[in-house]
Amino acid sequence: MATRNNGKSKAAGSKSGGGHGVGPWLGLGVIWILLDQLTKIAILKTFAYGESRPITGFFNLVLAYNRGAAFSFLAAAGGWQRWFFTGLGVAAALFIVWLLKRHSGQKLFCFALALILGGALGNVIDRLVYGHVVDFLDFHLRGYHWPAFNVADCGICIGAVLLIIDELRRVRR
């Protein structure tokens, strides 16, 4: 069964109603990309590759390159991974834009997707421009270092956690 809304057909029970369309969510994604890219530019201008500067007892800024995916997965592959992960990031971004269009009224869901979109495209830009992802956030404890990451990765992780929270809330309703 379909209902009419401003002359557009919408499936009954659709959860996308309301909202201001996809524009604000795409805008948030662009803001996240800019934050990611500006921080990377600042690090690239002030650090030599491998240089590390302690900030606290558990956090350093460091310039590291990642030719693979999360945790340097496939970093040592023969170079094909650059294009594979670039294509994967573009495909994910297109799917996210489609989801944003379908569900623009679901605030938490779309906020999460916008962060993931910004993060995915931030890392795609790195792969296209540099041939690798620029990482610089280094957390450590008692000699163990979490793999270095960046603002784009933060967007992806925060977005993923928010998607889980959104789904848990939806299941409870």
From Swiss-Prot:
The active site is at D135, D153. The chain crosses the membrane at residues 24-44, 55-75, 80-100, 105-125, 145-165. Pathway: Protein modification; lipoprotein biosynthesis (signal peptide cleavage). The keyword Cell membrane applies. It is found in: Cell inner membrane. It holds the Pfam family Peptidase_A8. It comes from the Bacteria. GO terms for biological process: proteolysis. It catalyses: Release of signal peptides from bacterial membrane prolipoproteins. Hydrolyzes -Xaa-Yaa-Zaa-|-(S,diacylglyceryl)Cys-, in which Xaa is hydrophobic (preferably Leu), and Yaa (Ala or Ser) and Zaa (Gly or Ala) have small, neutral side chains. The keyword Phosphoprotein does not apply. Its EC number is 3.4.23.36. It is a multi-pass membrane protein. Keywords: Aspartyl protease, Cell inner membrane, Cell membrane, Hydrolase, Membrane, Protease, Transmembrane, Transmembrane helix. GO terms for cellular component: plasma membrane. Coiled coil: none annotated. Its main location: membrane. One of its GO terms (molecular function) is aspartic-type endopeptidase activity. Belongs to the peptidase A8 family. This protein specifically catalyzes the removal of signal peptides from prolipoproteins. This is Lipoprotein signal peptidase. It comes from Ralstonia nicotianae (strain ATCC BAA-1114 / GMI1000). The lineage of its organism: Bacteria, Pseudomonadati, Pseudomonadota, Betaproteobacteria, Burkholderiales.
